[in-house]
Protein backbone atom coordinates (compact mmCIF):
# COMPACT_ATOMS: atom_id res chain seq x y z
CA UNK A 1 0.00 0.00 0.00
CA UNK A 2 1.40 3.43 -0.90
CA UNK A 3 1.67 6.27 1.58
CA UNK A 4 -0.96 9.00 1.22
CA UNK A 5 0.43 12.19 -0.28
CA UNK A 6 -0.97 15.70 0.02
CA UNK A 7 -2.87 16.87 -3.02
CA UNK A 8 -3.23 20.39 -4.27
CA UNK A 9 -5.41 21.64 -7.08
CA UNK A 10 -4.48 24.47 -9.42
CA UNK A 11 -7.32 26.62 -8.13
CA UNK A 12 -6.19 26.73 -4.51
CA UNK A 13 -4.13 29.92 -4.77
CA UNK A 14 -6.69 31.72 -6.92
CA UNK A 15 -9.57 30.68 -4.67
CA UNK A 16 -7.69 31.71 -1.54
CA UNK A 17 -6.77 35.09 -3.02
CA UNK A 18 -10.36 35.67 -4.15
CA UNK A 19 -11.68 34.83 -0.67
CA UNK A 20 -9.08 37.04 0.99
CA UNK A 21 -9.93 40.03 -1.22
CA UNK A 22 -13.68 39.40 -0.96
CA UNK A 23 -13.75 39.28 2.84
CA UNK A 24 -10.76 41.53 3.57
CA UNK A 25 -7.99 41.15 6.12
CA UNK A 26 -6.79 43.60 8.76
CA UNK A 27 -3.33 43.27 10.31
CA UNK A 28 -2.40 45.07 13.53
CA UNK A 29 1.05 44.55 14.99
CA UNK A 30 2.98 46.34 17.72
CA UNK A 31 6.62 45.40 18.13
CA UNK A 32 8.89 46.85 20.80
CA UNK A 33 12.53 46.11 21.56
CA UNK A 34 13.56 47.21 25.04
CA UNK A 35 16.54 46.88 27.32
CA UNK A 36 15.51 47.38 30.91
CA UNK A 37 13.11 50.32 30.98
CA UNK A 38 14.52 51.88 27.80
CA UNK A 39 12.67 51.26 24.56
CA UNK A 40 15.19 51.00 21.73
CA UNK A 41 12.86 50.30 18.83
CA UNK A 42 9.12 50.54 18.35
CA UNK A 43 7.16 49.54 15.26
CA UNK A 44 3.41 49.88 14.77
CA UNK A 45 1.93 48.21 11.70
CA UNK A 46 -1.63 48.75 10.55
CA UNK A 47 -2.62 47.26 7.20
CA UNK A 48 -5.89 46.42 5.49
CA UNK A 49 -6.00 44.17 2.44
CA UNK A 50 -9.25 44.01 0.48
CA UNK A 51 -10.65 44.51 -2.99
CA UNK A 52 -11.86 48.00 -3.87
CA UNK A 53 -15.44 46.74 -3.78
CA UNK A 54 -15.08 45.34 -0.25
CA UNK A 55 -13.24 48.43 0.96
CA UNK A 56 -15.97 50.71 -0.45
CA UNK A 57 -18.68 48.65 1.24
CA UNK A 58 -16.93 49.15 4.60
CA UNK A 59 -16.26 52.84 3.93
CA UNK A 60 -12.47 52.72 3.89
CA UNK A 61 -10.59 55.75 2.57
CA UNK A 62 -8.92 55.52 -0.83
CA UNK A 63 -5.68 57.13 -2.06
CA UNK A 64 -5.85 60.40 -3.98
CA UNK A 65 -6.48 59.82 -7.67
CA UNK A 66 -8.71 56.77 -7.24
CA UNK A 67 -11.61 56.71 -9.71
CA UNK A 68 -14.33 56.71 -7.06
CA UNK A 69 -17.19 56.52 -9.56
CA UNK A 70 -15.95 53.11 -10.71
CA UNK A 71 -15.36 51.96 -7.13
CA UNK A 72 -18.83 52.94 -5.93
CA UNK A 73 -20.42 51.42 -9.05
CA UNK A 74 -18.54 48.15 -8.55
CA UNK A 75 -19.47 48.09 -4.86
CA UNK A 76 -23.13 48.65 -5.64
CA UNK A 77 -23.28 51.81 -3.52
CA UNK A 78 -26.13 54.21 -4.35
CA UNK A 79 -25.27 57.69 -5.57
CA UNK A 80 -26.71 59.11 -2.33
CA UNK A 81 -24.54 56.80 -0.24
CA UNK A 82 -21.43 57.53 -2.29
CA UNK A 83 -20.97 60.82 -0.43
CA UNK A 84 -20.44 58.88 2.77
CA UNK A 85 -17.77 56.83 1.01
CA UNK A 86 -16.18 59.78 -0.77
CA UNK A 87 -16.29 62.32 2.04
CA UNK A 88 -15.18 60.72 5.26
CA UNK A 89 -14.69 63.12 8.18
CA UNK A 90 -11.24 63.23 9.71
CA UNK A 91 -10.96 61.29 12.97
CA UNK A 92 -11.03 63.45 16.11
CA UNK A 93 -7.65 64.36 17.51
CA UNK A 94 -6.83 64.52 21.19
CA UNK A 95 -4.57 67.38 22.07
CA UNK A 96 -2.12 67.03 24.91
CA UNK A 97 -2.35 63.25 25.07
CA UNK A 98 1.39 62.79 24.65
From Swiss-Prot:
Induction per the UniProt record: In PHH4 (a deletion of the p-vac locus) transcribed in all growth phases, maximal expression in mid-stationary phase. An unstable 6kb transcript able to cover gvpD-gvpE-gvpF-gvpG-gvpH-gvpI-gvpJ-gvpK-gvpL-gvpM is detected, as well as smaller transcripts. Gas vesicles appear earlier when grown in static culture, possibly due to O(2)-limitation.
Residue ranges of coiled coil: none
Source organism of the structure: Halobacterium salinarum (strain ATCC 700922 / JCM 11081 / NRC-1)
Keyword annotations: Gas vesicle, Plasmid
Region called Disordered, residue ranges: 75-98
Phylogenetic lineage: Archaea, Methanobacteriati, Methanobacteriota, Stenosarchaea group, Halobacteria
One GO cellular component, as annotated: gas vesicle
Disulfide-bonded cysteines: none
Chief place where the protein resides: other
More details: Encoded in a 14-gene locus called c-vac which produces cylindrical gas vesicles only in the stationary growth phase.
Summary of the function given for this chain in its UniProt record: A minor component of the gas vesicle. Proteins GvpF to GvpM might be involved in nucleating gas vesicle formation. Gas vesicles are hollow, gas filled proteinaceous nanostructures found in several microbial planktonic microorganisms. They allow positioning of halobacteria at the optimal depth for growth in the poorly aerated, shallow brine pools of their habitat. Expression of 2 c-vac DNA fragments containing 2 divergently transcribed regions (gvpE-gvpF-gvpG-gvpH-gvpI-gvpJ-gvpK-gvpL-gvpM and gvpA-gvpC-gvpN-gvpO) allows H.volcanii to produce gas vesicles.
InterPro entries: Gas-vesicle_GvpA-like, GvpA, GvpA-like_CS
NCBIfam families associated with the record: halo_gas_GvpJ
Family membership: Belongs to the gas vesicle GvpA family.
Compartments in which it is found: Gas vesicle
Protein origin, superkingdom: Archaea
Name listed for the protein in its UniProt record: Gas vesicle protein J2
Assembly, per entry: GvpF to GvpM interact with each other in vitro, and may form multi-subunit complex(es). Interacts with GvpA.
GO terms for MF: structural molecule activity
